[in-house]
Amino acid sequence: MRTNPTTSRPGVSTIEEKSVGRIDQIIGPVLDITFPPGKLPYIYNALIVKSRDTADKQINVTCEVQQLLGNNRVRAVAMSATDGLMRGMEVIDTGTPLSVPVGGATLGRIFNVLGEPIDNLGPVDTSATFPIHRSAPAFIELDTKLSIFETGIKVVDLLAPYRRGGKIGLFGGAGVGKTVLIMELINNIAKAHGGVSVFGGVGERTREGNDLYMEMKESGVINEKNIEESKVALVYGQMNEPPGARMRVGLTALTMAEYFRDVNKQDVLLFIDNIFRFVQAGSEVSALLGRMPSAVGYQPTLSTEMGSLQERITSTKKGSITSIQAVYVPADDLTDPAPATTFAHLDATTVLSRGLASKGIYPAVDPLDSTSTMLQPRIVGNEHYETAQRVKETLQRYKELQDIIAILGLDELSEEDRLTVARARKIERFLSQPFFVAEVFTGSPGKYVGLAETIRGFQLILSGELDGLPEQAFYLVGNIDEASTKAINLEEESKLKK
């Protein structure tokens, strides 16, 4: 993409050289602007409207050029509300695309789509900025090696492992522990990989964004006393904002993540909540830009817009961006163009189950519904693959037997099936784990469990070596040795009670 360089001559301010246009037409968030001949801005250039409204209030609206209409007119989408704008107002072409602050100074802070801090903690202490529209890494720069991204969370690492530099879809309703899982991943990547995280709130509720910020401060993911030691940068474009902001806030978050990957050479975790809202915002402005709607009223450029975002999320030889994207499925229709286009880019899916959450098993990741393209013998090795398959088989058999148990009871099952049920219940409880970020609420210290320890633990349960231990011993522990210790403690407690 070409940029419009602004040259500076001695004694002449750069603002005077920038071309100035005037607003011709305003339709919601879309503006038509006329510029002098030969002074047209480039596609994606940022335009600024600075003026005063009829009540003499300051107006400062940033727009992004989307189309060149001919006759020296351009069509732009506003990044904030267009209230108070009038035809004839002056519009300044900045000569560059929207650029946002990047680097360590962004950690612990909250930004809007323009990269302006909105947390009342003063300006950001950095001079480094990146444009939000950047090319995806060249093919030669990509790291093609398939490697597992260890999270330290047993159920994820064993049954639906994440790919380093991959894209993961997070499916879950309200109140099943999505926020806590997100915060634990942010915490673990910082501790185990020395990495940082960027959270992009795309079209989410303002209340949820505020709750997440407060919980992050409470759990230590954001360090209030020493903000530089925080592990995450937050970028919000909430539901109440115009579609222009919601359409671009994902790119703002991604740009901040790219700096950590390309310049700081770090492993970065990028959260996008919700990727559906990114598509929805594009669909809102598409008709106003004069495009013919496609299937189900979505924009005809849906695949291109999704691809331009997703292709930038990848591993290079310098570092990686691993992305976890919350996916809303409208009316539970997986064939809807928005989720269907998203699925094409995902390497793994993590499904949170309300049934498990109601049993008190956290993280409430459904072991049978969650999937990963990485769970193949040639990638994870035979030992990991076979253990995962046997765990799934045991849980699947338990699921099939539950109706029989509910009607006839456990005693009517064969000896083999009773053993399967006992082991499945132990596996189900062993898939739970105390989280570091939940220490504040539970009082139990968090546990990071390495992949080798996870595999060993499930192998011991499947082999029958631990059939003698009570199933409570496997609930909310880290590795398998802790389960054995907990069993001894439970036995001693029961003796004391007697």
From Swiss-Prot:
It is an enzyme of class 7 (translocase). Pfam families: ATP-synt_ab (PF00006), ATP-synt_ab_N (PF02874), ATP-synt_VA_C (PF22919). It comes from the Eukaryota. GO terms for cellular component: chloroplast thylakoid membrane; mitochondrion; proton-transporting ATP synthase complex. It is found in: Plastid, Chloroplast thylakoid membrane. SMART domains: AAA (SM00382). ATP binds at G172, G173, A174, G175, V176, G177, K178, T179. It catalyses: ATP + H2O + 4 H(+)(in) = ADP + phosphate + 5 H(+)(out). Its EC number is 7.1.2.2. It is a peripheral membrane protein. The keyword ATP-binding applies. Keywords: ATP synthesis, ATP-binding, CF(1), Chloroplast, Hydrogen ion transport, Ion transport, Membrane, Nucleotide-binding, Plastid, Thylakoid, Translocase, Transport. InterPro entries: AAA+_ATPase, ATP-synt_VA_C, ATP_synth_F1_bsu, ATPase_a/bsu_AS, ATPase_alpha/beta_chains, ATPase_F1/V1/A1_a/bsu_N, ATPase_F1/V1/A1_a/bsu_N_sf, ATPase_F1/V1/A1_a/bsu_nucl-bd. GO terms for biological process: proton motive force-driven mitochondrial ATP synthesis. GO terms for molecular function: ATP binding; ATP hydrolysis activity; proton-transporting ATP synthase activity, rotational mechanism. F-type ATPases have 2 components, CF(1) - the catalytic core - and CF(0) - the membrane proton channel. CF(1) has five subunits: alpha(3), beta(3), gamma(1), delta(1), epsilon(1). CF(0) has four main subunits: a(1), b(1), b'(1) and c(9-12). Belongs to the ATPase alpha/beta chains family. Produces ATP from ADP in the presence of a proton gradient across the membrane. The catalytic sites are hosted primarily by the beta subunits. HAMAP family: ATP_synth_beta_bact (MF_01347). This is ATP synthase subunit beta, chloroplastic. It comes from Sorghum bicolor. The gene is atpB.
